[in-house]
Amino acid sequence: MKLTAKTDIEAPASFVYASLIDHAAWEREVIRRGAEVERPADMPLTGVGAGWRLKVPFRGKVRKLLVRIDALTPDARLVFGIEGQAVEGSSVLELLPMSPRSTRLRLALEVRPKTLAARLFLNTLRLAKGKVQARLEKRVEQLGARIEDQHDRSRGRDGKV
């Protein structure tokens, strides 16, 4: 199953990229949402190959996932690999500078089933793809707004024009 979303952010691509690779902030966000995060000892802390083991409560069960950074292109692209017992996939975040102070963030998410149960679940999601797509777009817009707020605060403004 493939999903995409995009949003425009009033911040330079370098600032958006720095926000997206802030591992500590992402770990706090995931923990706030109820997941457990573990940094595997056999993976680097930053850069390509860095990863996290997640235990995520989903539909009444705890799902275990391994998320790793597969590729980084500074100020342009991040690629994450996702592996679980039932699914695998990838997430690609691309940054397109629109102007020196504006960046378009594009997210492409692909999830592939590894088991029959996962295939049935993804087929069910395909039936509700409109809702799933809308939720993803909303999350990406919220991420963009959060990065804009961080940028405004870093420049000493309150975000009001």
Model-derived features: positions:
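Extended beta-strand/beta-hairpin segments
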Residues: 2, 97-98, 118, 152-161
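Short, surface-exposed coil-to-beta transition loops
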Residues: 2-4, 62-66, 87-92
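Glycine-rich portal/gate segments that line the openings of hydrophobic small-molecule binding cavities
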Residues: 28, 38-85, 138-156
